Amino acid sequence: MAKYSTLSLILLTLSLLPPSSARPKLLLFLIDGFRFDYISDGELQHLPGFRHMVERGVKVDYMTPAFPSLSYPNYYTLMTGRHCETHHMTGNFMWDPKKNISFDIGANEDSRLPQWWDGAEPLWVTMEKAKRKVSMYYWPGCEVEIRAIKPNYCREYFYYPSEAEFGKSVTDALQSLTRGNAEMAAVYYERIDVEGHHHGPWSEERKNVTRELDQILWHLHQQIREMGLESELNVILFSDHGMTDVFWMDKVIELKNYIDMQDIIQMKDRGPVVSLWPAEGKLSKVYEELRAVQHMNVYQKEDIPERFHYKKGTFVSPLTLVAELGWFIIERKEKLPFWNNGTSINIAWQHGWHGYDNELMDMRGVFLAYGPDFKVNFRSAPIRSTDVYNIMCNVLGIEPLPNNGSWSRVQFMLRSSSGFPTTLHLINLWLSVLPLSLILF
């Protein structure tokens, strides 16, 4: 009799697991460089698409990015819930001195090597392992085989998709969800970041692109309503970091004025965070010379502040330079990153940048969400980029992997903070009841 009772309990436990068809699907948007105050209450008056999301869902006051407040480190933090020193994607530019290979903002072939990506498992890989399909559009990294897995569909990133191409990707993502080709669709949008860099965070060019994005979002909301998907689809929109003004003619730190560049065997990146690998026997000399430089801090690896959650990263350099807000570190001014402004020559400075101390206000990002799992017209306290992973796992019914996010910071934005019963919880419940069943029968 006991074996039949045990079988009954197993069947009861399995019956509590929600069928995949019962779970709302998820549409994700990663908007690069979208600062939190781009959708302040005043700005929302002119952005009906964003306003729709706010009024029908959740808006956090702001989202603090991971350090450094750069793109690739935060792409991976958002999709793994881990600090950069834990997933090891610690910069847009990295170097492996043992193999003498580089990761150069995903543009070079070596950037696709597993060593840069296998430090953690992003959500789309976890879903594919669970036989739950994912479609991704221009999402950096979807083209990479991570832990021997790629998403079911990846429309590979290029620099940079037009508004028409982005609009089509949104339509295609929605269709992939409604036609049963995916349970999660993720779309990346870059132009807010591009115009913020080129013209500055409060430029008319950046504002115009925001209005174009808003129109696409408004059209999406209409499609969801017309297709009757309000109760079947969650929509989440977040950014990787913010943006601040830079004034290069006045606020440039030229390293050549302070150190002998012959003492450096490798330098990665420029701007707010710079990584240096001094030649053998030159570390102390270079460090002491850089300590005297104003408007920046220099850290030996072991002295990097704990709050950055950065120094334990595999590819962190012996010396890390961190500039004050608005200052730009470069070897010499001639190497400043210009853009050609539509001409054949480099004639224009950049006017916006990011990557600074992640606690600075201008580096803060945005998080919006609406759908059947989210409260309506709910303003949430600030969250961190590590927290987003747990939200996505909850609405998808995925057991989250170990991560650095906080559930207590985000649970109140959900209609039900308990979420779906997970397999682990149900197994624990079954094990607690099993001894009683053996006694009774």
Swiss-Prot record:
It catalyses: sn-glycerol 3-phosphocholine + H2O = phosphocholine + glycerol + H(+); a 1-acyl-sn-glycero-3-phosphocholine + H2O = a 1-acyl-sn-glycerol + phosphocholine + H(+); a 1-O-alkyl-sn-glycero-3-phosphocholine + H2O = a 1-O-alkyl-sn-glycerol + phosphocholine + H(+); 1-dodecanoyl-sn-glycero-3-phosphocholine + H2O = 1-dodecanoyl-sn-glycerol + phosphocholine + H(+). Residues 1-22 form the signal peptide. The active site is at S71. A lipid is attached at S416 (GPI-anchor amidated serine). The keyword rRNA-binding does not apply. SUPFAM superfamilies: Alkaline phosphatase-like (SSF53649). Its EC number is 3.1.4.-, 3.1.4.38. Glycans are attached at N100, N208, N341, N404. The keyword Lipoprotein applies. Residues 417-441 form a propeptide. Its cofactor is Zn(2+). Zn(2+) 1 binds at D32, S71, D240, H241. Substrate binds at D32, S71, N92, D193, H241, H354. Choline-specific glycerophosphodiester phosphodiesterase. Has a lysophospholipase C activity. Choline-specific glycerophosphodiesterase that hydrolyzes glycerophosphocholine (GPC) and lysophosphatidylcholine (LPC) and contributes to supplying choline to the cells. Has a preference for LPC with short (12:0 and 14:0) or polyunsaturated (18:2 and 20:4) fatty acids. In vitro, hydrolyzes only choline-containing lysophospholipids, such as sphingosylphosphorylcholine (SPC), platelet-activating factor (PAF) and lysoPAF, but not other lysophospholipids. Belongs to the nucleotide pyrophosphatase/phosphodiesterase family. PANTHER family: ECTONUCLEOTIDE PYROPHOSPHATASE/PHOSPHODIESTERASE, GLYCEROPHOSPHOCHOLINE CHOLINEPHOSPHODIESTERASE ENPP6. This is Glycerophosphocholine cholinephosphodiesterase ENPP6. It comes from Xenopus laevis (African clawed frog).
